[in-house]
Amino acid sequence: MAAGSWTAGLLAFALLCLPWPQEASAFPAMPLSSLFANAVLRAQHLHQLAADTYKEFERAYIPEGQRYSIQNAQAAFCFSETIPAPTGKDEAQQRSDMELLRFSLLLIQSWLGPVQFLSRAFTNTLVFGTSDRVYEKLKDLEEGIQALMRELEDGSPRVGQLLKQTYDKFDTNLRGDDALLKNYGLLSCFKKDLHKAETYLRVMKCRRFVESSCVF
C-alpha cells in the first residue's frame, strides 16, 4: 500500500475513534472542522454498510429478473419521502446548515428502533456486525449531529417533528415472499436515507471548509 494511502487510512480510523465532545464544562471544545469531519466519516461508513447489506440481501433472496420491477414498486415506500427534505446535492445547497442538520437528525432517529431487529432477521453473513453495533453507530452519529446543532444554533425556527411515522421492524420470518419483500424494501430505504444524511453533511462541510474532496 502506498505511504499516502496508509497515512490517510490511519487518519480516518483515528477520526472514527474520537469521542464526541460532551458538555463544555467537562471537556474542551472540539474544533468545528473536526466535528464535521467526524460526522461525515461516520455517515459515509454507515451508508456503505447499508449499501453492502442491501446488495448481499438482494443477491441471496431476490431473483435477478424481478429486481427492477420490485425497485420501481418501492419508489414511494420510504416514509422519509413524506418530509420536505432535499433529494440531492443541488437542492441541499439551497438549504441552511441548520435545516440540513435537522433533516439529518430526523432521518437517523427514524431508524433507531428498526435496526435493533437486524440480527434477528438475517444470518450473520448478511448483517454488518450485530444489530447492537449498528444501533450504536446510529446513536453515535445522532450524538454528533446534535453536537453540531449546538455549535451552530442560530435561533431560526425548527423544522419540527415532521417524520411522524417511523419504520417498521424487520421481519424475522424469511420463508414467505411478503416478509422478503418487506425486508428488501426496508433495506432500500435505509440505504437511501443514509445517503441523504451523508450528502447533507458533506454539503455543509464543503461549503464551510473548502477542500479538494468537495467534488462528489
Swiss-Prot record:
One of its GO terms (cellular component) is extracellular space. Keywords: Disulfide bond, Hormone, Metal-binding, Phosphoprotein, Secreted, Signal, Zinc. CDD domains: somatotropin_like. Residues 1-26 form the signal peptide. The lineage of its organism: Eukaryota, Metazoa, Chordata, Craniata, Vertebrata. It comes from Oryctolagus cuniculus (Rabbit). Pfam families: Hormone_1. Disulfide bonds join 78-189, 206-214. It is found in: Secreted. It comes from the Eukaryota. This is Somatotropin. PANTHER family: SOMATOTROPIN, SOMATOTROPIN,PROLACTIN. Plays an important role in growth control. Its major role in stimulating body growth is to stimulate the liver and other tissues to secrete IGF1. It stimulates both the differentiation and proliferation of myoblasts. It also stimulates amino acid uptake and protein synthesis in muscle and other tissues. Zn(2+) binds at residues 45, 198. Belongs to the somatotropin/prolactin family. The modification Phosphoserine is found at residue 131. GO terms for molecular function: growth factor activity; growth hormone receptor binding; hormone activity; metal ion binding. One of its GO terms (biological process) is response to food.
